[in-house]
Amino acid sequence: MTAIIKEFVSRNKRRYQEDGFDLDLTYIYPNIIAMGFPAERLEGVYRNNIDDVVRFLDSKHKNHYKIYNLCAERHYDTNKFSCRVAQYPFEDHNPPQLELIKPFCEDLDQLLSENENVAAIHCKAGKGRTGVMICAYLLHRGKFPRAQEALDFYGEVRTRDKKGVTIPSQRRYVYYYSYLLKNSLEYRPVPLLFHKIEFETIPMFSGSTCNPQFVVYQLKVKIFTSTAGPKRAEKLMYFDFPQPLPVCGDIKVEFFHKQNKVMKKEKMFHFWVNTFFIPGPEEYSEKVENGTLVGEQELDGIYSTERSDNDKEYLTLALTKNDLDKANKDKANRLFSPNFKVKLFFTKTVEESSNSEASSSTSVTPDVSDNEPDHYRYSDTTDSDPENEPFDEDQITQITKV
Protein backbone atom coordinates (compact mmCIF):
# COMPACT_ATOMS: atom_id res chain seq x y z
CA MET A 1 0.00 0.00 0.00
CA THR A 2 2.83 2.42 0.88
CA ALA A 3 4.44 1.83 -2.53
CA ILE A 4 1.14 2.61 -4.25
CA ILE A 5 0.78 5.86 -2.29
CA LYS A 6 4.34 6.92 -3.10
CA GLU A 7 3.81 6.17 -6.79
CA PHE A 8 0.60 8.23 -6.78
CA VAL A 9 2.24 11.22 -5.05
CA SER A 10 5.23 11.23 -7.41
CA ARG A 11 2.87 11.15 -10.42
CA ASN A 12 4.83 11.09 -13.68
CA LYS A 13 8.28 11.57 -12.20
CA ARG A 14 10.75 8.76 -12.71
CA ARG A 15 11.54 6.87 -9.50
CA TYR A 16 14.65 4.98 -8.40
CA GLN A 17 13.47 1.41 -7.85
CA GLU A 18 16.61 -0.68 -7.57
CA ASP A 19 18.63 -2.43 -4.85
CA GLY A 20 15.68 -2.46 -2.47
CA PHE A 21 15.05 1.31 -2.75
CA ASP A 22 11.85 2.97 -3.92
CA LEU A 23 12.56 6.70 -4.00
CA ASP A 24 11.28 9.73 -5.88
CA LEU A 25 14.78 10.26 -7.21
CA THR A 26 16.38 10.45 -10.65
CA TYR A 27 19.96 10.67 -11.85
CA ILE A 28 19.92 13.60 -14.29
CA TYR A 29 23.64 12.96 -14.80
CA PRO A 30 25.75 10.39 -12.95
CA ASN A 31 26.79 13.13 -10.52
CA ILE A 32 23.55 15.16 -10.37
CA ILE A 33 20.46 13.80 -8.63
CA ALA A 34 16.98 15.36 -8.66
CA MET A 35 14.77 14.14 -5.83
CA GLY A 36 11.70 14.88 -3.77
CA PHE A 37 11.85 16.34 -0.27
CA PRO A 38 13.43 14.01 2.35
CA ALA A 39 10.53 13.97 4.78
CA GLU A 40 10.09 12.82 8.36
CA ARG A 41 7.22 11.37 10.40
CA LEU A 42 3.91 10.84 8.57
CA GLU A 43 4.99 12.76 5.48
CA GLY A 44 7.83 10.28 5.07
CA VAL A 45 5.21 7.59 4.37
CA TYR A 46 4.17 9.13 1.05
CA ARG A 47 7.26 11.17 0.18
CA ASN A 48 10.92 10.18 0.37
CA ASN A 49 11.58 9.05 3.93
CA ILE A 50 14.64 10.93 5.14
CA ASP A 51 16.19 7.80 6.64
CA ASP A 52 15.82 5.97 3.32
CA VAL A 53 17.50 8.88 1.54
CA VAL A 54 20.40 8.83 4.02
CA ARG A 55 20.74 5.07 3.56
CA PHE A 56 20.70 5.43 -0.22
CA LEU A 57 23.33 8.18 -0.34
CA ASP A 58 25.57 6.44 2.19
CA SER A 59 25.39 3.19 0.24
CA LYS A 60 26.01 4.78 -3.17
CA HIS A 61 28.09 7.90 -2.50
CA LYS A 62 29.33 7.75 1.10
CA ASN A 63 31.30 10.87 2.09
CA HIS A 64 31.04 12.17 -1.46
CA TYR A 65 27.62 13.82 -1.61
CA LYS A 66 26.08 17.17 -0.78
CA ILE A 67 22.39 18.06 -0.49
CA TYR A 68 21.00 21.25 -2.03
CA ASN A 69 17.69 22.27 -0.41
CA LEU A 70 15.73 24.76 -2.53
CA CYS A 71 12.69 24.95 -0.23
CA ALA A 72 11.92 28.28 1.40
CA GLU A 73 8.98 26.80 3.29
CA ARG A 74 10.52 23.82 5.08
CA HIS A 75 13.66 22.38 6.62
CA TYR A 76 14.85 19.17 8.28
CA ASP A 77 17.58 17.96 10.59
CA THR A 78 20.76 18.46 8.54
CA ASN A 79 22.66 16.31 11.05
CA LYS A 80 21.08 13.33 9.31
CA PHE A 81 23.32 14.15 6.34
CA SER A 82 26.36 15.02 8.48
CA CYS A 83 25.49 18.69 7.85
CA ARG A 84 26.41 18.39 4.17
CA VAL A 85 23.43 20.55 3.20
CA ALA A 86 23.42 23.87 1.33
CA GLN A 87 20.31 26.04 1.15
CA TYR A 88 19.31 28.16 -1.83
CA PRO A 89 15.68 28.83 -0.93
CA PHE A 90 12.84 30.21 -3.02
CA GLU A 91 9.06 29.84 -2.92
CA ASP A 92 7.14 26.93 -4.40
CA HIS A 93 5.74 27.55 -7.90
CA ASN A 94 7.92 30.67 -8.30
CA PRO A 95 11.29 31.34 -9.94
CA PRO A 96 14.36 32.05 -7.84
CA GLN A 97 15.66 35.54 -7.27
CA LEU A 98 17.91 35.97 -10.29
CA GLU A 99 20.90 36.75 -8.08
CA LEU A 100 20.56 33.31 -6.48
CA ILE A 101 21.34 31.35 -9.65
CA LYS A 102 25.00 32.14 -10.24
CA PRO A 103 26.16 31.44 -6.63
CA PHE A 104 24.28 28.13 -6.78
CA CYS A 105 26.02 27.18 -10.04
CA GLU A 106 29.42 28.17 -8.69
CA ASP A 107 28.84 26.17 -5.50
CA LEU A 108 27.82 23.13 -7.54
CA ASP A 109 30.78 23.58 -9.85
CA GLN A 110 33.18 23.55 -6.93
CA LEU A 111 31.60 20.40 -5.49
CA LEU A 112 31.63 18.48 -8.77
CA SER A 113 35.20 19.47 -9.60
CA GLU A 114 36.19 16.47 -7.49
CA ASN A 115 35.54 13.39 -9.57
CA GLU A 116 33.59 11.22 -7.11
CA ASN A 117 31.34 13.93 -5.70
CA VAL A 118 27.60 13.92 -6.28
CA ALA A 119 24.96 16.64 -5.78
CA ALA A 120 21.45 15.70 -4.63
CA ILE A 121 19.13 18.61 -5.38
CA HIS A 122 15.56 18.87 -4.14
CA CYS A 123 12.61 21.16 -3.55
CA LYS A 124 9.27 19.75 -2.33
CA ALA A 125 8.25 17.63 -5.31
CA GLY A 126 11.73 17.62 -6.84
CA LYS A 127 10.54 18.82 -10.22
CA GLY A 128 9.92 22.54 -10.90
CA ARG A 129 12.31 24.46 -8.67
CA THR A 130 14.80 21.62 -8.86
CA GLY A 131 14.60 21.68 -12.65
CA VAL A 132 15.15 25.43 -12.86
CA MET A 133 18.42 25.20 -10.96
CA ILE A 134 19.65 22.04 -12.66
CA CYS A 135 18.92 23.47 -16.12
CA ALA A 136 20.71 26.68 -15.16
CA TYR A 137 23.73 24.65 -14.10
CA LEU A 138 23.76 22.60 -17.30
CA LEU A 139 23.86 25.89 -19.22
CA HIS A 140 26.51 27.23 -16.84
CA ARG A 141 28.67 24.21 -17.67
CA GLY A 142 28.05 24.57 -21.41
CA LYS A 143 26.30 21.21 -21.69
CA PHE A 144 23.62 22.80 -23.88
CA PRO A 145 23.83 25.90 -26.09
CA ARG A 146 20.21 26.94 -25.54
CA ALA A 147 17.80 27.07 -22.65
CA GLN A 148 15.13 25.12 -24.52
CA GLU A 149 17.49 22.20 -25.05
CA ALA A 150 18.39 22.05 -21.36
CA LEU A 151 14.71 22.21 -20.39
CA ASP A 152 13.79 19.47 -22.88
CA PHE A 153 16.60 17.25 -21.63
CA TYR A 154 15.58 17.67 -18.00
CA GLY A 155 11.92 16.99 -18.78
CA GLU A 156 12.82 13.79 -20.63
CA VAL A 157 15.14 12.43 -17.94
CA ARG A 158 13.15 13.43 -14.83
CA THR A 159 9.61 12.60 -15.99
CA ARG A 160 7.73 10.06 -18.06
CA ASP A 161 5.58 12.70 -19.79
CA LYS A 162 8.39 15.16 -20.63
CA LYS A 163 6.88 17.80 -18.35
CA GLY A 164 9.78 18.93 -16.21
CA VAL A 165 9.82 22.69 -15.66
CA THR A 166 6.34 23.70 -16.80
CA ILE A 167 5.56 27.01 -15.05
CA PRO A 168 6.18 29.87 -17.52
CA SER A 169 7.91 32.21 -15.06
CA GLN A 170 10.27 29.46 -13.93
CA ARG A 171 11.14 28.66 -17.53
CA ARG A 172 11.64 32.38 -18.22
CA TYR A 173 14.35 32.57 -15.58
CA VAL A 174 16.22 29.68 -17.20
CA TYR A 175 16.14 31.69 -20.42
CA TYR A 176 17.32 34.77 -18.53
CA TYR A 177 20.36 32.94 -17.20
CA SER A 178 21.06 31.46 -20.63
CA TYR A 179 21.04 34.94 -22.14
CA LEU A 180 23.51 36.24 -19.54
CA LEU A 181 25.87 33.34 -20.24
CA LYS A 182 25.52 33.50 -24.01
CA ASN A 183 26.37 37.19 -24.10
CA SER A 184 28.94 37.16 -21.26
CA LEU A 185 26.90 39.71 -19.31
CA GLU A 186 27.21 40.52 -15.63
CA TYR A 187 23.77 40.86 -14.11
CA ARG A 188 22.89 44.05 -12.26
CA PRO A 189 19.43 45.09 -11.09
CA VAL A 190 18.08 47.88 -13.31
CA PRO A 191 15.70 50.48 -11.80
CA LEU A 192 12.75 51.37 -14.03
CA LEU A 193 9.47 53.26 -13.79
CA PHE A 194 6.39 51.11 -14.43
CA HIS A 195 3.73 53.18 -16.25
CA LYS A 196 0.90 50.99 -17.50
CA ILE A 197 -0.37 47.55 -18.45
CA GLU A 198 -2.45 46.67 -21.47
CA PHE A 199 -4.62 43.61 -22.23
CA GLU A 200 -5.12 42.60 -25.85
CA THR A 201 -8.53 40.87 -25.94
CA ILE A 202 -10.79 40.91 -22.90
CA PRO A 203 -10.70 37.97 -20.44
CA MET A 204 -14.03 36.17 -20.17
CA PHE A 205 -14.51 36.13 -16.40
CA SER A 206 -18.21 36.73 -15.59
CA GLY A 207 -18.93 36.92 -19.28
CA SER A 208 -18.18 40.34 -20.73
CA THR A 209 -18.13 42.05 -17.32
CA CYS A 210 -14.59 41.09 -16.33
CA ASN A 211 -13.29 43.44 -13.63
CA PRO A 212 -9.54 42.85 -13.22
CA GLN A 213 -7.51 44.14 -10.29
CA PHE A 214 -3.81 43.63 -9.74
CA VAL A 215 -0.96 43.84 -7.26
CA VAL A 216 2.78 44.27 -7.79
CA TYR A 217 5.45 42.67 -5.61
CA GLN A 218 9.15 43.38 -5.26
CA LEU A 219 11.45 41.56 -2.83
CA LYS A 220 8.38 39.62 -1.63
CA VAL A 221 6.82 42.93 -0.58
CA LYS A 222 3.55 44.16 -2.03
CA ILE A 223 4.35 47.63 -3.38
CA PHE A 224 1.18 48.46 -5.32
CA THR A 225 -2.51 47.52 -5.27
CA SER A 226 -4.81 48.77 -8.01
CA THR A 227 -7.91 50.65 -6.93
CA ALA A 228 -9.31 52.21 -10.09
CA GLY A 229 -10.94 50.04 -12.73
CA PRO A 230 -9.38 49.59 -16.17
CA LYS A 231 -10.06 51.76 -19.19
CA ARG A 232 -11.80 49.85 -21.93
CA ALA A 233 -11.74 49.91 -25.70
CA GLU A 234 -12.78 47.38 -28.31
CA LYS A 235 -10.89 44.18 -27.44
CA LEU A 236 -8.50 46.16 -25.20
CA MET A 237 -8.09 47.02 -21.51
CA TYR A 238 -5.68 49.59 -20.06
CA PHE A 239 -4.39 49.91 -16.51
CA ASP A 240 -2.57 53.16 -15.76
CA PHE A 241 -0.62 53.66 -12.55
CA PRO A 242 -1.68 56.87 -10.74
CA GLN A 243 1.99 57.80 -10.91
CA PRO A 244 4.93 55.84 -12.32
CA LEU A 245 5.86 52.99 -9.98
CA PRO A 246 9.59 52.56 -9.25
CA VAL A 247 10.59 48.90 -9.70
CA CYS A 248 13.95 47.15 -9.78
CA GLY A 249 15.10 43.58 -10.36
CA ASP A 250 12.63 40.72 -9.86
CA ILE A 251 8.98 41.81 -9.86
CA LYS A 252 5.77 39.83 -9.70
CA VAL A 253 2.44 41.06 -11.08
CA GLU A 254 -0.69 39.20 -10.02
CA PHE A 255 -4.16 39.72 -11.51
CA PHE A 256 -7.51 38.94 -9.88
CA HIS A 257 -11.11 39.23 -11.00
CA LYS A 258 -13.55 40.66 -8.49
CA GLN A 259 -17.10 41.04 -9.73
CA ASN A 260 -18.24 43.23 -6.85
CA LYS A 261 -17.41 44.14 -3.25
CA VAL A 262 -19.27 41.11 -1.90
CA MET A 263 -17.66 38.47 -4.10
CA LYS A 264 -14.25 37.04 -3.29
CA LYS A 265 -11.31 37.66 -5.57
CA GLU A 266 -10.77 35.03 -8.25
CA LYS A 267 -7.18 34.44 -9.33
CA MET A 268 -6.68 35.15 -13.04
CA PHE A 269 -2.93 34.81 -13.63
CA HIS A 270 0.45 36.09 -12.52
CA PHE A 271 3.96 36.42 -13.90
CA TRP A 272 7.50 37.25 -12.88
CA VAL A 273 9.87 39.41 -14.93
CA ASN A 274 13.24 41.00 -14.25
CA THR A 275 13.89 44.61 -15.20
CA PHE A 276 17.37 43.86 -16.58
CA PHE A 277 15.77 42.06 -19.53
CA ILE A 278 13.31 44.76 -20.56
CA PRO A 279 14.68 46.57 -23.65
CA GLY A 280 14.37 50.19 -24.68
CA PRO A 281 14.07 51.65 -28.21
CA GLU A 282 17.84 52.08 -28.61
CA GLU A 283 18.46 48.48 -27.52
CA TYR A 284 16.40 46.82 -30.24
CA SER A 285 19.07 47.09 -32.92
CA GLU A 286 21.54 45.22 -30.70
CA LYS A 287 19.33 42.75 -28.88
CA VAL A 288 16.69 41.84 -31.43
CA GLU A 289 17.26 40.26 -34.81
CA ASN A 290 14.31 39.03 -36.87
CA GLY A 291 12.11 39.07 -33.79
CA THR A 292 14.48 37.09 -31.57
CA LEU A 293 17.43 37.86 -29.36
CA VAL A 294 20.80 37.74 -31.05
CA GLY A 295 22.50 34.58 -29.84
CA GLU A 296 19.31 33.00 -28.47
CA GLN A 297 16.69 31.84 -30.92
CA GLU A 298 13.91 30.75 -28.57
CA LEU A 299 13.37 33.52 -26.00
CA ASP A 300 9.58 33.68 -26.02
CA GLY A 301 8.19 35.87 -23.28
CA ILE A 302 11.30 37.99 -22.75
CA TYR A 303 11.34 40.50 -25.59
CA SER A 304 8.74 41.72 -28.02
CA THR A 305 9.32 43.58 -31.26
CA GLU A 306 5.77 44.92 -31.38
CA ARG A 307 5.90 48.72 -31.12
CA SER A 308 3.51 51.44 -32.23
CA ASP A 309 4.40 55.09 -32.83
CA ASN A 310 2.64 56.01 -29.59
CA ASP A 311 4.87 53.65 -27.59
CA LYS A 312 8.25 54.76 -28.89
CA GLU A 313 9.20 56.41 -25.61
CA TYR A 314 8.54 53.24 -23.61
CA LEU A 315 10.52 50.12 -22.85
CA THR A 316 7.93 47.51 -23.77
CA LEU A 317 7.49 43.85 -22.89
CA ALA A 318 4.72 41.65 -24.32
CA LEU A 319 3.70 38.34 -22.77
CA THR A 320 1.46 35.89 -24.60
CA LYS A 321 -1.09 33.66 -22.93
CA ASN A 322 1.45 30.83 -22.76
CA ASP A 323 3.88 33.14 -20.94
CA LEU A 324 1.44 33.72 -18.05
CA ASP A 325 1.34 31.44 -15.02
CA LYS A 326 -2.12 29.85 -14.64
CA ALA A 327 -3.56 31.46 -17.80
CA ASN A 328 -1.38 29.11 -19.85
CA LYS A 329 -3.44 26.18 -18.56
CA ASP A 330 -6.66 27.47 -20.15
CA LYS A 331 -6.35 25.06 -23.08
CA ALA A 332 -10.05 25.23 -23.93
CA ASN A 333 -9.90 29.05 -24.22
CA ARG A 334 -12.77 29.29 -21.75
CA LEU A 335 -11.39 32.33 -19.89
CA PHE A 336 -8.80 33.75 -22.27
CA SER A 337 -8.76 33.89 -26.05
CA PRO A 338 -5.81 32.13 -27.72
CA ASN A 339 -4.57 35.59 -28.76
CA PHE A 340 -4.66 37.05 -25.24
CA LYS A 341 -1.60 39.16 -24.53
CA VAL A 342 -0.35 41.38 -21.71
CA LYS A 343 1.88 44.36 -22.56
CA LEU A 344 3.96 46.19 -19.96
CA PHE A 345 5.27 49.73 -20.39
CA PHE A 346 8.30 51.14 -18.58
CA THR A 347 10.74 54.04 -18.79
CA LYS A 348 14.25 54.39 -17.47
CA THR A 349 14.84 56.35 -14.30
CA VAL A 350 17.32 59.15 -13.71
CA GLU A 351 19.03 56.73 -11.33
CA GLU A 352 19.42 54.13 -14.08
CA SER A 353 20.95 56.69 -16.41
CA SER A 354 23.54 57.83 -13.87
CA ASN A 355 24.06 54.91 -11.48
CA SER A 356 25.01 51.49 -12.79
CA GLU A 357 25.34 50.11 -9.25
CA ALA A 358 21.61 50.18 -8.49
CA SER A 359 20.48 47.13 -6.60
CA SER A 360 17.24 45.26 -6.13
CA SER A 361 18.06 45.37 -2.44
CA THR A 362 17.11 49.05 -2.46
CA SER A 363 14.43 49.56 0.15
CA VAL A 364 10.85 49.25 -1.01
CA THR A 365 7.73 50.73 0.53
CA PRO A 366 5.06 48.14 1.35
CA ASP A 367 1.54 48.82 0.12
CA VAL A 368 -0.99 48.16 2.89
CA SER A 369 -3.89 50.04 1.35
CA ASP A 370 -6.13 47.06 0.64
CA ASN A 371 -5.96 45.29 4.03
CA GLU A 372 -6.47 41.98 2.22
CA PRO A 373 -4.55 38.72 2.68
CA ASP A 374 -1.18 38.63 0.97
CA HIS A 375 -1.32 36.18 -1.94
CA TYR A 376 2.45 36.14 -2.49
CA ARG A 377 2.67 32.47 -1.52
CA TYR A 378 -0.14 31.46 -3.88
CA SER A 379 0.32 27.82 -4.82
CA ASP A 380 -1.43 25.94 -7.59
CA THR A 381 -0.67 22.25 -7.31
CA THR A 382 -2.55 21.34 -10.49
CA ASP A 383 0.09 22.78 -12.80
CA SER A 384 0.23 21.23 -16.25
CA ASP A 385 1.76 23.29 -19.01
CA PRO A 386 2.17 22.59 -22.73
CA GLU A 387 4.33 19.57 -23.35
CA ASN A 388 7.90 20.20 -24.38
CA GLU A 389 8.98 19.43 -27.92
CA PRO A 390 10.02 15.79 -28.48
CA PHE A 391 13.51 15.02 -27.26
CA ASP A 392 16.02 12.78 -28.99
CA GLU A 393 16.13 9.69 -26.79
CA ASP A 394 19.48 8.65 -28.29
CA GLN A 395 21.08 11.40 -26.21
CA ILE A 396 20.02 9.70 -22.99
CA THR A 397 22.31 6.74 -23.57
CA GLN A 398 25.35 8.97 -24.11
CA ILE A 399 25.33 10.79 -20.76
CA THR A 400 28.60 11.21 -18.89
CA LYS A 401 29.35 13.21 -15.78
CA VAL A 402 28.92 16.96 -15.96
UniProtKB/Swiss-Prot annotation:
It is found in: Cytoplasm; Nucleus; Nucleus, PML body; Cell projection, Dendritic spine. GO terms for molecular function: inositol-1,3,4,5,6-pentakisphosphate 3-phosphatase activity; inositol-1,3,4,5-tetrakisphosphate 3-phosphatase activity; lipid binding; PDZ domain binding; phosphatidylinositol-3,4,5-trisphosphate 3-phosphatase activity; phosphatidylinositol-3,4-bisphosphate 3-phosphatase activity; phosphatidylinositol-3-phosphate phosphatase activity; protein serine/threonine phosphatase activity. Gene3D superfamilies: 2.60.40.1110, Protein tyrosine phosphatase superfamily (3.90.190.10). Residues 382-395 have a biased composition (Acidic residues). CDD domains: PTP_PTEN. Monoubiquitinated. Deubiquitinated. Its cofactor is Mg(2+). Its main location: cytoplasm. It holds the Pfam family PTEN_C2. Its EC number is 3.1.3.16, 3.1.3.48, 3.1.3.67, 3.1.3.-. Residues 354-368 have a biased composition (Low complexity). GO terms for cellular component: cell projection; cytoplasm; cytosol; dendritic spine; nucleus; plasma membrane; PML body; postsynaptic density. It catalyses: a 1,2-diacyl-sn-glycero-3-phospho-(1D-myo-inositol-3,4,5-trisphosphate) + H2O = a 1,2-diacyl-sn-glycero-3-phospho-(1D-myo-inositol-4,5-bisphosphate) + phosphate; O-phospho-L-seryl-[protein] + H2O = L-seryl-[protein] + phosphate; O-phospho-L-threonyl-[protein] + H2O = L-threonyl-[protein] + phosphate; O-phospho-L-tyrosyl-[protein] + H2O = L-tyrosyl-[protein] + phosphate. Belongs to the PTEN phosphatase protein family. Dual-specificity protein phosphatase, dephosphorylating tyrosine-, serine- and threonine-phosphorylated proteins. Also functions as a lipid phosphatase, removing the phosphate in the D3 position of the inositol ring of PtdIns(3,4,5)P3/phosphatidylinositol 3,4,5-trisphosphate, PtdIns(3,4)P2/phosphatidylinositol 3,4-diphosphate and PtdIns3P/phosphatidylinositol 3-phosphate with a preference for PtdIns(3,4,5)P3. Monomer. This is Phosphatidylinositol 3,4,5-trisphosphate 3-phosphatase and dual-specificity protein phosphatase PTEN. It comes from Xenopus laevis (African clawed frog).
